[in-house]
């Protein structure tokens, strides 16, 4: 999938242009892909004054807009804008994560893939744009790789049971 082409195409749609006319203070904060919807990408814009996100679910045939959702965050940190200059393509990031998975967890069969391009300030104080790639497996495990979005360096990796995310 060419996510940057999808972003450019979204920005040319009537829905986006009409929305952007009255919402200039919003800026791009994330791109979200889930393998259940292989031809769709969610593109998120953030308003720091309102602490809200407007999401565009974009595919070649449609645009669905979810306006002004409140940001749920424990830290109340302002989301940083995505600067796309020099960012590696989606397909290259996925290929890199799959090679790590093959090397470390080759027996785990992937059921679902989630890929997010986002700023992450848990890695460095100033933040870093990352490809956050999550594989959910048939054996109820979650394999997570965080890759530097520019050079695809592996920044962190972990594997957990999906049940570890359930609050008791």
Can you say where each PLM-predicted feature lies in the sequence?
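Long, terminal "pre-/pro-" and other extracytoplasmic accessory regions
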Residues: 1-168
